[in-house]
Amino acid sequence: MNLRRLSWRDHAAQQWPYALIAIALWCAMLPLGATRASASATALPAHAEWPESYRGQALRPLALSAVEQHFAAQFPGRIARFAVADGSELVLRDVNRPTRMLHPAADCWRGIGWRIEATRLERDDDALLWRCFDAVKEGQRVRVCERIVDAQGRSFTDTSAWFWAASLQQSQGPWQALTRVEDKS
């Protein structure tokens, strides 16, 4: 059995790859730690009221379903659903920190059994960009459009792009995710 004592220099030469990996992982996590520390500064006021109108049309609050209530209880922000005077629905999600719980609406619709078709980017009458798709289930068709807006008015149509911009502090909150649903049957 050859038990030779390694010099400090030999030991360091063998261990440097592990140290490099540890430093790289630590550096990669720095932006996420900074966001957590600043989350309380961007917290949403608990007393903030939801809007009474959207683009000049009256909003009527709707109750959240049991599934939505369960999700909302764990959500880092607040969620509300409204009937719009034009017959569509509007879901508002206010978020006070970057979270993967704010995910694409298509994931939710797919998860409750709808088939997703024709995903596309669209501009509305005010030239605002939305990510839209058609959801189809048992002969019913709805058009769903979504976007996320930060505190400075910058918008995102891709939740992953929003998440990384928010996590790296390139977008400041609080943020509001808007999801419009129109019946197309």
Model-derived segments and spans:
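Short, solvent-exposed recognition patches
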Residues: 49-166
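Hydrophobic membrane-insertion alpha-helices, especially the h-region
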Residues: 13-34
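A residue-level signal for conserved active-site and pocket-lining positions in enzyme catalytic cores
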Residues: 26, 57, 178
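Alpha-helical transmembrane signal-anchor/signal-peptide segments
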Residues: 35-55
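Surface-exposed amphipathic alpha-helical segments
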Residues: 164-167, 172-185
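Cytosolic-side transmembrane helix boundary signature
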Residues: 1-17
